């Protein structure tokens, strides 16, 4: 499989497959394809994985698209203004991503639920509590919100993030929750009570326009139907 990622700020990834190659995707993610692409809807690994996907914010079912009788083409478009990034997954090169980041992948990539190891992260992490772990072998395409900034963290190096801005990280990074210091800062700072602290070693991808923050910003301007 080879691919190109085109367009901004609403990108699309166009995948060219050899005969017999398969792509996995969420329902409704396919944008266009050649007529020889065969679709099959599956639970993608049984009941346990099916409910695990639901718990991490994804659909119960996975669509498999296979090129039959020769080369095929299939495209997957982003659902929100932002960026599509390709990641090569292999043993020891796992990626942990925000909920609903998964767009498509080759057949060898596996998706599971990633829970924070620290109890405090679970209770107070908000959007960061449940994330997706991408493992196995292959290429995965993730969609992020807004502009993406990447950081390489050395062992023990930290970055403090408003939780919704964490798009993805390599599995070697760890997460904890930090309370905003000072009661006045908590009550009047407008930044919430908790921040996410990411500790290296590893790479971190941060997004500039989380959907939840955008929705909150525009909601006062949406007319009330009542």
What are these regions (language model features)?
Residues 1-226:
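Composition-driven recognition of glycine/serine/threonine/acidic- and proline-rich low-complexity segments
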């Amino acid at each position: 499989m080879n691919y190109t990622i085109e367009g901004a700020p609403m990108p699309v990834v166009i995948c060219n497959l050899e005969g017999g190659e398969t792509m996995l995707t969420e329902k409704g993610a396919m944008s266009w394809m050649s007529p020889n692409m065969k679709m099959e809807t599956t639970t993608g690994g049984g009941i346990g994985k099916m409910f695990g996907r639901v718990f991490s914010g994804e659909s119960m079912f996975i669509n498999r698209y296979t090129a039959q009788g020769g080369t095929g083409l299939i495209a997957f478009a982003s659902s929100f203004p932002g960026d599509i990034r390709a990641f090569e997954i292999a043993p020891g090169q796992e990626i942990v991503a925000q909920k609903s980041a998964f767009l498509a992948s080759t057949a060898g990539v596996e998706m599971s639920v990633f829970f924070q190891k620290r109890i405090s992260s679970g209770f107070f992490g908000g959007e960061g509590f449940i994330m997706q772990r991408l493992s196995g072998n292959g290429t995965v395409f993730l969609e992020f919100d807004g502009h993406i900034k990447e950081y390489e963290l050395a062992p023990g190096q930290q970055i403090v993030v408003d939780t919704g801005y964490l798009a993805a990280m390599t599995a070697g990074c760890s997460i904890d929750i930090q309370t905003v210091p000072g009661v006045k800062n908590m009550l009047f700072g407008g930044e919430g009570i908790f921040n996410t602290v990411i500790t290296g070693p590893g790479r971190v991808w941060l997004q500039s326009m989380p959907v939840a923050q955008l929705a909150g910003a525009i909601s006062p301007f949406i007319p009330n139907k009542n």
